[in-house]
Amino acid sequence: LLDDGHRPEMKKLAEEYGVRYLSRATNEHAKAGNLNYGLENSHGDFICIFDADHCPQQNFITNTIGYFADKNVAFVQTPQDFYNLDSFQHRQGKNNKGLWSEQSLFFRVIQRGKDYWNAAFFCGSCAIVRRSSLESIGGFATGTLTEDLHTSIRLHKKGYRSIYMQQSMAYGIAPSNVEPFLSQRVRWGQGAMQVWKKEGILTGKGLTIAQRLNYLASVLTYFDGWQKGLFYLAPAIVLTTGIMPIEAINI
């Protein structure tokens, strides 16, 4: 249990369950620094990573470890699913059928496509990583707000493979209201820009053309806000000007 909060109650909880508790003297490099501290104070060949709110299923390791038979596989990422289905980012499907999360498109469609091009990236939780691969790039990447994306691109530059496994193996807590939701997305956007600048997605060495395009697409999604702005303004423009965005042509 890596605790950057230095909480006595967490230490006590870890002791009750026979879990090793680690807490740093400083919080340098935030989550990436905390993960690297855990890396330095452990010796396992593979590292399973879960955010504090994620609960893995008992068969997580047995279902993911087989991919590492390929010595070039650096990490296996699984979907990030949630058990608080009344969260801010969950919505009921059409005609009240099914339930989808704001992240469903990414984990059900986009990551699968990225996996085809060996460009699926580590998402910071619900994943298992090979220690030797991490050590070859100096551990979890620091210096940006998104250590997961940053670490992924460094591993891919080294020529390692990534695997995206579609089966849900862990469940966490999604943001319950708009404030933490926006804070999380702003952090992701800022981190993506930092990674772009530091790693040179288009110019840096080591990535295939397909990987460059996949990483570029992930970064450029944070420039899509203006499209939603126009979408929200469209009804007001139609009502005040009478100009329809689409004109039907009868033949």
Locate the predicted segments by residue.
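Cofactor-binding loop segments of dinucleotide-utilizing enzymes, especially the Rossmann-like FAD-
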Residues: 4, 78, 167
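Long helical/loop segments within the catalytic core of UDP-sugar-dependent glycosyltransferases
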Residues: 15-18, 22-46, 58-145, 156-157, ...
